[in-house]
Amino acid sequence: MLEDLGYMYRFSDTSSSEVRGKEIAEGFLSVCEYTGLKGRWQVISEHPKVVCDTGHNVGGWEYISKQLSQVECNKMHIVFGMVEDKDIDGILALLPKNATYYFTKSRNKRSVSENVLKIIGEQQGLIGECYPTVIDAWESAKNAAKPDDFVFIGGSSYVVADFLENSI
């Protein structure tokens, strides 16, 4: 959709338009606020800081992993689940090793078992426990987190959807 907007802008006559580059940039920076789009580095709370993101492929996780590496916190907790048609090994290789993991699965039938994620995660140096639902994983992470910790929920749009539908 954003590509379509860029295409429309590129090939439209903007010479008489009152909208300038600055306004367009501000619009893109506020797209979640203006459109109601949820789940893209969405901050849920501050103490502890809780963020969810729907990134679900290697390209998205290359970006998310950079963001996670810049987070300043005492301890990082990651509630994580995926669907089976994604590059599980490739994505798990991008996850921070210094976090505690809460491996889970969404209600979607294509979800990878939390037990499988844990096994593959351990091969990548990721340490954590398994939870049968996103909400169980979230509750455990929330209870373990201190005010100066960071909790991330993601790995799949379905994981974020389960979280947002049932926890806020």
Language-model features: where?
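Nucleotide phosphate-binding/pyrophosphate-handling subdomain across enzymes
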Residues: 1-100
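C-terminal helical cap/extension that packs against the catalytic core
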Residues: 3, 49-50, 91-150
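Short, Lys/Arg-enriched, disordered terminal segments
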Residues: 13-19, 147, 165-168
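Short glycine-/acidic-enriched loop or helix-start segments at secondary-structure transitions
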Residues: 61-62, 88-90, 113-114, 162-165
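Short, well-ordered alpha-helices that flank and scaffold nucleotide-derived cofactor binding pockets
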Residues: 66-70, 93, 119, 143, ...
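Active-site-proximal loop/hinge segments that shape catalytic or ion-binding/gating pockets
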Residues: 156
